[in-house]
Amino acid sequence: MTSEAMDTLGQYKITVWEEESFQGKRCEFLMECPSIMERGFRKIRSIKVESGPWVGFEYPEYQGQQFILEKGDYPRWEAWSGNSGYRTEHLLSFRPVKCANHNDSKAILYEAENFQGHKFELSDDYPSLQAMGWGNKEVASIKVNAGAWVAYQYPGYRGYQYVLERDRQNGEFKKYSEYSSQAHTNQIQSIRRIQH
């Protein structure tokens, strides 16, 4: 076991079930899982996060839509997709969000790609970026200086979710297509710090 794995042992724990309402085959994880199918599962339909924040993905190898999974119970897909407007009834891969630090999170939003144009510095949650002074519905690039964030397509933490971490891509997302493997738009209207 690597020293990194030893350092995080116990900080992250997730239990997954193959069926809704915590039924069927189950398995506990303390580390990332690039493909639940390699563990003999067809899909994940319910989840219990016991410690640490996690991000779940629609497809194997951390591809597809992202869904933030913070401490709590997720008996059905609606619990993790929330008001996303995007329906995915299962997850096929997941990993811990190791750099989440709710008390020390900083990010800068930019109106143009490559960190150009008008910028907006963040250190708090914003259920509506426009209500807080961001002039438009789009964010073309983001620099995460500390912690981890989840950005949403619409106000009120709704729509597609993009998990943005300081320790991924050095915290630099130069264009919206780097927000996730399935980033369909640069429309971001709410953003919050990930709870640890």
Curated annotation (Swiss-Prot):
Any single GO BP term: lens development in camera-type eye
Superkingdom: Eukaryota
Domain spans labelled Beta/gamma crystallin 'Greek key': 12-51, 52-98, 105-146, 147-195
SMART domains assigned: XTALbg
Alphabetical keyword list: Eye lens protein, Repeat
Region N-terminal arm, residue ranges: 1-11
GO molecular function, one term: structural constituent of eye lens
Function as written in the Swiss-Prot or TrEMBL entry: Crystallins are the dominant structural components of the vertebrate eye lens.
Subunit structure: Homo/heterodimer, or complexes of higher-order. The structure of beta-crystallin oligomers seems to be stabilized through interactions between the N-terminal arms.
Domain notes: Has a two-domain beta-structure, folded into four very similar Greek key motifs.
Protein name: Beta-crystallin A2
Organism expressing this protein natively: Gallus gallus
Lineage: Eukaryota, Metazoa, Chordata, Craniata, Vertebrata
